């Protein structure tokens, strides 16, 4: 049998909530160009991610990877903390 090569999406964003146990909410910001007017529009994506060791705080910049569904809303997993929140 041949094995499928799985490519996981990796996104970088800011932690906006860590109230749940072993879970964080990450906001990912991207800019898209309007097709007609050419103006860049800010689009945000809020993802729930699995934080196994509860090591993230609000304001941290993190990298998350897509994974199998962990719960009803969690389909992302924490890969690394890029930058800690100041203060």
Curated annotation (Swiss-Prot):
Organism the protein comes from: Dichelobacter nodosus (strain VCS1703A)
Pfam families: Ribosomal_S17
Name of the encoding gene: rpsQ
Role, per record: One of the primary rRNA binding proteins, it binds specifically to the 5'-end of 16S ribosomal RNA.
Keyword annotations: Ribonucleoprotein, Ribosomal protein, RNA-binding, rRNA-binding
Lineage: Bacteria, Pseudomonadati, Pseudomonadota, Gammaproteobacteria, Cardiobacteriales
Protein name: Small ribosomal subunit protein uS17
One example of a Gene Ontology biological process annotation: translation
Nuclease listed as a keyword: no
Gene Ontology terms: cellular component: cytosolic small ribosomal subunit
Family classification: Belongs to the universal ribosomal protein uS17 family.
Superkingdom of origin organism: Bacteria
């Amino acid at each position: 049998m041949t094995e499928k090569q799985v490519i996981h999406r990796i996104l970088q964003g800011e932690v906006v909530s860590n109230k749940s146990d072993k879970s964080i909410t990450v906001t990912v910001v991207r800019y898209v160009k309007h097709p007609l007017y050419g103006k860049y529009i800010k689009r945000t994506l809020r993802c729930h991610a699995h934080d196994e060791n509860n090591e993230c705080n609000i304001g941290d910049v993190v990298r998350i990877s897509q994974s199998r569904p962990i719960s009803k809303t969690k389909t992302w997993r924490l890969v690394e903390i890029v930058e800690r929140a100041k203060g």
